[in-house]
Amino acid sequence: MYEQISPDTSHIRYEETDLSYLKLRPYRFKCGIYLICIQGKSIISTGVQQYAFDEQTELIFLTGSLIQIIQASADFKVRILLFPKDVFLKAILPIDTPYFNYVHEHPHYHHTADERSQNTWREIVLWMDVAQMLFKNNNTLLFRKQQELNFLQSILMWLFNTIPEKLAANKQYSRKQMLCHQFMQLIREHST
Protein backbone atom coordinates (compact mmCIF):
# COMPACT_ATOMS: atom_id res chain seq x y z
CA MET A 1 0.00 0.00 0.00
CA TYR A 2 1.33 3.40 -1.00
CA GLU A 3 0.90 6.72 0.79
CA GLN A 4 -1.59 9.30 -0.43
CA ILE A 5 -0.02 12.00 -2.60
CA SER A 6 -0.60 15.64 -1.69
CA PRO A 7 -2.91 17.42 -4.22
CA ASP A 8 -0.51 20.34 -4.58
CA THR A 9 3.23 20.84 -4.42
CA SER A 10 5.67 23.72 -4.05
CA HIS A 11 8.42 21.82 -5.86
CA ILE A 12 8.69 19.07 -8.49
CA ARG A 13 8.06 15.62 -7.04
CA TYR A 14 8.43 12.11 -8.41
CA GLU A 15 6.38 9.20 -7.05
CA GLU A 16 5.58 5.58 -7.82
CA THR A 17 2.15 4.47 -6.63
CA ASP A 18 -0.93 2.35 -7.26
CA LEU A 19 -3.25 5.37 -6.78
CA SER A 20 -5.45 3.19 -4.53
CA TYR A 21 -6.58 6.21 -2.49
CA LEU A 22 -8.23 7.59 -5.65
CA LYS A 23 -10.73 4.70 -5.65
CA LEU A 24 -12.64 6.08 -2.67
CA ARG A 25 -13.53 9.49 -4.07
CA PRO A 26 -12.44 12.05 -6.69
CA TYR A 27 -9.27 13.94 -5.84
CA ARG A 28 -8.47 17.43 -7.14
CA PHE A 29 -4.85 17.99 -8.09
CA LYS A 30 -4.01 21.70 -8.11
CA CYS A 31 -0.55 21.15 -9.57
CA GLY A 32 0.39 19.73 -12.95
CA ILE A 33 0.48 15.95 -13.09
CA TYR A 34 2.08 13.61 -15.61
CA LEU A 35 1.41 9.89 -15.21
CA ILE A 36 2.74 6.85 -17.05
CA CYS A 37 1.40 3.35 -16.45
CA ILE A 38 4.15 0.79 -16.00
CA GLN A 39 2.07 -2.19 -14.88
CA GLY A 40 -1.54 -3.36 -14.83
CA LYS A 41 -4.53 -1.38 -16.02
CA SER A 42 -7.24 0.95 -14.80
CA ILE A 43 -9.95 3.34 -15.86
CA ILE A 44 -9.28 6.92 -14.80
CA SER A 45 -12.08 9.50 -14.71
CA THR A 46 -11.81 13.29 -14.66
CA GLY A 47 -15.55 13.62 -14.08
CA VAL A 48 -15.96 14.66 -17.72
CA GLN A 49 -13.90 12.03 -19.53
CA GLN A 50 -12.81 8.45 -18.82
CA TYR A 51 -9.48 7.04 -19.98
CA ALA A 52 -8.35 3.42 -20.34
CA PHE A 53 -4.99 3.53 -18.61
CA ASP A 54 -2.81 0.46 -19.08
CA GLU A 55 0.86 -0.37 -19.65
CA GLN A 56 2.68 2.02 -21.96
CA THR A 57 0.06 4.75 -21.59
CA GLU A 58 0.63 8.42 -20.70
CA LEU A 59 -1.78 10.92 -19.17
CA ILE A 60 -0.90 14.58 -18.59
CA PHE A 61 -2.81 17.47 -17.04
CA LEU A 62 -0.68 20.62 -17.21
CA THR A 63 -2.59 22.69 -14.67
CA GLY A 64 -4.19 20.04 -12.51
CA SER A 65 -7.40 18.05 -12.73
CA LEU A 66 -10.04 16.14 -10.84
CA ILE A 67 -9.04 12.46 -10.93
CA GLN A 68 -10.69 9.27 -9.73
CA ILE A 69 -9.87 5.60 -10.32
CA ILE A 70 -13.06 3.87 -11.49
CA GLN A 71 -11.46 0.42 -11.51
CA ALA A 72 -7.93 -0.96 -11.39
CA SER A 73 -6.22 -4.33 -11.62
CA ALA A 74 -4.47 -5.62 -8.49
CA ASP A 75 -1.05 -5.08 -10.08
CA PHE A 76 -1.75 -1.50 -11.26
CA LYS A 77 1.29 0.79 -10.84
CA VAL A 78 2.17 4.25 -12.19
CA ARG A 79 5.09 6.65 -12.19
CA ILE A 80 4.05 10.26 -11.51
CA LEU A 81 5.67 13.63 -11.97
CA LEU A 82 4.00 16.46 -10.03
CA PHE A 83 4.98 20.03 -10.81
CA PRO A 84 3.89 23.35 -9.25
CA LYS A 85 1.99 25.89 -11.27
CA ASP A 86 4.59 28.65 -10.84
CA VAL A 87 7.41 26.47 -12.23
CA PHE A 88 5.14 25.38 -15.07
CA LEU A 89 4.31 29.00 -16.00
CA LYS A 90 8.01 29.88 -16.19
CA ALA A 91 8.93 26.71 -18.10
CA ILE A 92 6.19 27.06 -20.71
CA LEU A 93 7.05 30.63 -21.82
CA PRO A 94 9.17 29.69 -24.87
CA ILE A 95 6.73 27.00 -26.02
CA ASP A 96 4.10 27.92 -28.61
CA THR A 97 0.33 27.81 -28.14
CA PRO A 98 -0.25 24.75 -30.39
CA TYR A 99 1.31 22.60 -27.67
CA PHE A 100 -1.38 23.69 -25.19
CA ASN A 101 -4.07 23.01 -27.75
CA TYR A 102 -2.79 19.51 -28.45
CA VAL A 103 -2.34 18.54 -24.80
CA HIS A 104 -5.73 19.97 -23.87
CA GLU A 105 -7.42 18.00 -26.65
CA HIS A 106 -5.28 14.85 -26.26
CA PRO A 107 -4.08 14.40 -22.64
CA HIS A 108 -4.08 10.60 -23.08
CA TYR A 109 -1.75 8.60 -25.30
CA HIS A 110 -1.30 4.83 -25.57
CA HIS A 111 1.94 3.71 -27.21
CA THR A 112 1.56 1.31 -30.12
CA ALA A 113 3.88 -1.49 -31.27
CA ASP A 114 5.50 0.53 -34.07
CA GLU A 115 9.15 1.52 -33.73
CA ARG A 116 8.56 5.29 -33.40
CA SER A 117 6.06 4.82 -30.59
CA GLN A 118 8.24 2.28 -28.76
CA ASN A 119 11.24 4.63 -28.98
CA THR A 120 9.12 7.42 -27.50
CA TRP A 121 8.00 5.09 -24.68
CA ARG A 122 11.61 4.18 -23.83
CA GLU A 123 12.49 7.88 -23.82
CA ILE A 124 9.66 8.84 -21.46
CA VAL A 125 10.78 6.07 -19.10
CA LEU A 126 14.27 7.63 -19.21
CA TRP A 127 12.77 11.04 -18.39
CA MET A 128 11.02 9.47 -15.39
CA ASP A 129 14.32 7.86 -14.33
CA VAL A 130 15.94 11.32 -14.34
CA ALA A 131 12.99 12.73 -12.37
CA GLN A 132 13.39 9.92 -9.84
CA MET A 133 17.10 10.65 -9.51
CA LEU A 134 16.57 14.40 -9.02
CA PHE A 135 13.26 14.75 -7.21
CA LYS A 136 12.42 11.61 -5.22
CA ASN A 137 12.64 11.79 -1.42
CA ASN A 138 12.55 15.60 -1.51
CA ASN A 139 16.29 15.89 -2.12
CA THR A 140 17.79 19.22 -1.09
CA LEU A 141 19.79 20.01 -4.18
CA LEU A 142 22.07 23.03 -4.19
CA PHE A 143 20.51 24.39 -7.39
CA ARG A 144 17.05 22.86 -6.97
CA LYS A 145 14.97 25.76 -8.33
CA GLN A 146 17.10 26.03 -11.47
CA GLN A 147 17.15 22.24 -11.94
CA GLU A 148 13.36 22.11 -11.61
CA LEU A 149 12.90 24.83 -14.21
CA ASN A 150 15.43 23.28 -16.60
CA PHE A 151 14.01 19.77 -16.19
CA LEU A 152 10.37 20.80 -16.66
CA GLN A 153 11.16 23.03 -19.63
CA SER A 154 13.22 20.26 -21.25
CA ILE A 155 10.61 17.55 -20.77
CA LEU A 156 7.84 19.84 -22.06
CA MET A 157 9.90 20.69 -25.15
CA TRP A 158 10.65 17.01 -25.66
CA LEU A 159 6.93 16.21 -25.38
CA PHE A 160 6.14 18.94 -27.88
CA ASN A 161 8.52 17.31 -30.34
CA THR A 162 6.74 13.95 -29.96
CA ILE A 163 3.40 15.35 -31.14
CA PRO A 164 2.55 13.76 -34.48
CA GLU A 165 2.84 16.47 -37.11
CA LYS A 166 -0.26 15.33 -38.97
CA LEU A 167 -2.54 15.83 -35.99
CA ALA A 168 -1.14 19.27 -35.18
CA ALA A 169 -1.12 20.47 -38.80
CA ASN A 170 -4.51 19.13 -39.91
CA LYS A 171 -6.53 20.67 -37.08
CA GLN A 172 -8.83 23.37 -38.45
CA TYR A 173 -9.67 26.25 -36.11
CA SER A 174 -12.39 28.85 -36.42
CA ARG A 175 -11.42 32.50 -36.84
CA LYS A 176 -12.45 33.14 -33.25
CA GLN A 177 -10.21 30.30 -31.99
CA MET A 178 -7.27 31.53 -34.07
CA LEU A 179 -7.61 35.06 -32.65
CA CYS A 180 -7.78 33.65 -29.13
CA HIS A 181 -4.64 31.53 -29.70
CA GLN A 182 -2.77 34.51 -31.16
CA PHE A 183 -3.85 36.66 -28.21
CA MET A 184 -2.67 34.05 -25.68
CA GLN A 185 0.65 33.73 -27.49
CA LEU A 186 1.14 37.52 -27.35
CA ILE A 187 0.38 37.52 -23.63
CA ARG A 188 2.99 34.84 -23.00
CA GLU A 189 5.57 36.59 -25.18
CA HIS A 190 5.16 39.94 -23.42
CA SER A 191 4.54 38.78 -19.85
CA THR A 192 8.20 38.69 -18.84
Each language-model region and where it sits:
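Generic protein-terminus/edge-of-domain signal
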Residues: M1-T57, G64
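A conserved hydrophobic position in a structured secondary element of the catalytic/binding core
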Residues: F61-L62, F83
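A hydrophobic/aromatic-rich effector-binding and dimerization subdomain
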Residues: M1-S10, I70-N137
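Hydrophobic alpha-helical core bundles mediating ligand binding, dimerization, or RNAP-core interactions
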Residues: I124, M128-Q132, E148, L152-F160, ...
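Short, Lys/Arg-enriched, Trp-marked, Pro/Gly-tolerant hinge/linker segments that flank
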Residues: A113-Q118, N138-E148, L159-T192
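Short beta-strand His + acidic residue motifs that chelate non-heme Fe in jelly-roll/DSBH
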Residues: I43-S45, I67-A74
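Short, glycine/serine-rich, charged loops/turns that create anion-binding
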Residues: K41, L66, K85-V87
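A structure-centric signal for secondary-structure junctions around beta-strands
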Residues: K30-C31, D75-K77, K145
